């Protein structure tokens, strides 16, 4: 499992990081 990273440079595996609606930049959920 790769970490998702937000637009602010924070990474994690929860929706806070993985959801595009929350500003995800990399390894986001969906395609």
From Swiss-Prot:
> Which SMART domains does the record match to this protein?
ChtBD1
Q: Which domain of life is it from?
A: Eukaryota
Query: Which PROSITE patterns does the record cross-reference, listed alphabetically?
Result: CHIT_BIND_I_2
- Entry's Gene Ontology molecular function annotations: chitin binding
Q: What tissue expression does the UniProt record report for this protein?
A: Seeds (at protein level).
Its biotech or industrial use comes down to:
Has potential use as a flocculating agent in water treatment processes.
Disulphide-bridged cysteine pairs: 4-18, 24-28
Biological process terms in GO annotation? defense response to fungus; killing of cells of another organism
Q: Which UniProt keywords apply?
A: Antimicrobial, Chitin-binding, Disulfide bond, Fungicide
Against Gene3D superfamilies, the record matches this protein to: Endochitinase-like
- Domain Chitin-binding type-1, chain residue ranges per copy: 1-30
Primary role: Chitin-binding protein which functions in defense against chitin-containing fungal pathogens.
Q: What is this protein called?
A: Morintide mO3
- Source taxonomy: Eukaryota, Viridiplantae, Streptophyta, Embryophyta, Tracheophyta
């Amino acid at each position: 499992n790769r970490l998702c990273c937000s637009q602010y440079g924070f990474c994690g595996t929860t929706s806070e990081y993985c959801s595009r609606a929350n500003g995800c930049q990399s390894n986001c959920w969906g395609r």
